[in-house]
Amino acid sequence: KNGNQQLLHDVGEQMQMFNAVAGVPAYYQDKLLAVLLLGEKHDGFGFDQQELDFFAALASDVAMAIRNAQLFMDLKKEADKNHDLFIRTMVVLSQAIEVKDKYTHGHTKRVTDIAVLVARQMALNESADFEEEFYENLYIASMLHDIGKIGVPEEVLNKNGTLTKEEYQIVQLHPRHGVEILSPLSELKESLDGVKYHHERYDGKGYPEGLSGEGIPIIAAIISVADAFDAMITDRSYRPGMTKAQAVEEVKRNAGTQFHPVPVKALVELYEKGRL
């Protein structure tokens, strides 16, 4: 009630400024949301009842529009809050695997950063036309691309020597494990292809399904390049990491066989610009 009185008081003070001769209140339920100010009629006569009824109906429509806008903004704030919580949850999930696999510390963030840079460079080259939503799906898929390694025994993940055939087969299951873990979350539907297919090869010799060429979802093809590049430049117990220059040359050499050529081209351009 005090708010309504204050609004009416403010309007009364400003009516002279707007040369208004009357004001029609716009209420939503018992809350005054606005006042529709009426100027003097051209003919100099006062407003008749029909005209006042029209402006009263218009004010009611204005009040409803304002209330709808307020409700929309409230919903958007709530959605943004929930979305931020969702993203933070994804970050926590991605960190879970790094606790288990000591050789991947920082790997997830680096892959995510590189993947998004590659996608934006592809768009800059006009070799791809991504909606903004794609970048978010890529971001999430990159963060969670190795989440399925939670299902791989630590002695296999952290083995210093060469994996046996059986151990390698266990590791190859991690994309499927990742999808099994994440598929109950409907919000991740558009990111699952990146998790499932980031170990597919352009020549069809990858896993888990042996997809090839353009049959590999582009979100997965981008993560594949970013993942491999970071793995190459990272020190492991059994070998030192390559320099970035060496890794870029290795990725280029495998374009069209292991990697989709388009994200490879974007990665090379990023390196040449000093952005990797």
Q: Where are these predicted regions, by residue range?
A:
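Metal-dependent catalytic cores of enzymes that make or break cyclic nucleotides
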Residues: Q6, H42, Q49, E78-D80, ...
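Short loop/turn motifs at secondary-structure junctions and domain boundaries
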Residues: G12-F18, G46-F47
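A short, aliphatic-rich beta-strand micro-motif
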Residues: N19-Y27, A34
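Sensor-regulatory modules in signal-transduction proteins
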Residues: A26-Q29, K41-D43
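Short glycine-/small-residue motifs
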Residues: A34-V35, K149
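Short beta-strand-to-loop transition segments that serve as allosteric relay/switch motifs
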Residues: V35-F45, E51
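Allosteric cytosolic regulatory segments
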Residues: A56-A63
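Heptad-repeat alpha-helical coiled-coil signal-transmission segments
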Residues: V62, N68, L75, A79-N82, ...
